[in-house]
Amino acid sequence: MKLAIFDYGAGNIFSLRIALEKQGASVDVINNFDAANNYSGLLLPGVGNFDPAIRSIRDYSSTSFSDYVKDKTPVLGICLGMEMFFEKSEEGKEKGLAVMEGEVVLLPNKFKIPHMGWNNIKIKKSNPLLDGVPDSSWVYFVHSYRVKPKNPDIVVADSDYGIDVPAVISKGNLYGTQFHPEKSGKIGSTMLQNFLRECKK
C-alpha cells in the first residue's frame, strides 16, 4: 500500500514517515494534489503554521482539496493538519480548507500555552480510528489551538485541559487528531494501523 504525506515545506516529517513505514506502508512525500489520487491514503502532518500551510496546498495544485476529498480517499489530519479542515483559524488570515464547518481558536491564556506533553483522551463514540484504543489512553500533544466544530457530533474523543479539547474528529473519509499519533507510543501505532486498514478498503 502506498500513502502520501503532504509537505508544507515547514519542518521535519521524518518521524511520521518512519511510523507509517513500520506499519508496512510505502510512503511518498508530495507537495501538490495533482497526483494524489495515485495513493491509498493521504496524511496532512502537524508541523508548520496555518497561513503558509494553507497557501502551500492552495497555490501549488491545480486540483483543489475539496475536489480531492470527494474521491473518498481516506485523509488523516494531524494537529495543524486537522485544524486546516475547518473554515478559519485565529492563527492566521487565510481561509481554511472548509471541508468541515467551524473554526480554530487559541487555547485560553489562563492555561499554559502551548499544551505540550502527555494527556489522556475520553472516547465519546466508537470510530474505526479508535478500534483497540482503550478509553483514557494517553497520547502526546503539542498545540496552542483547538477546533470548534459547528457540528459537535464529529468529535469522537476529547481531552481535558481545563476545558474540553476535541482530540479526535471524524467525518466521512476525513479523520483528525489534535495530538501526534507518531509520537504517542503503542496507542498512536494502533491508530495509524487503523488508518491504514481504512485505506485498504
Q: Where do the language-model regions lie?
A:
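Short, surface-exposed beta-strand/loop micro-motifs that present aromatic residues
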Residues: 163-171
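Short acidic low-complexity segments
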Residues: 27-38
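Acyltransferase
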Residues: 177-201
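Extreme N-terminal starter segment of soluble prokaryotic enzymes
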Residues: 1-4
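Cysteine-nucleophile active-site neighborhood
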Residues: 48-117
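Pocket-forming structural segment of enzyme catalytic cores
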Residues: 88-163
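Beta-strand-turn-beta hairpins that frame and shape the catalytic cleft
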Residues: 136, 170-174
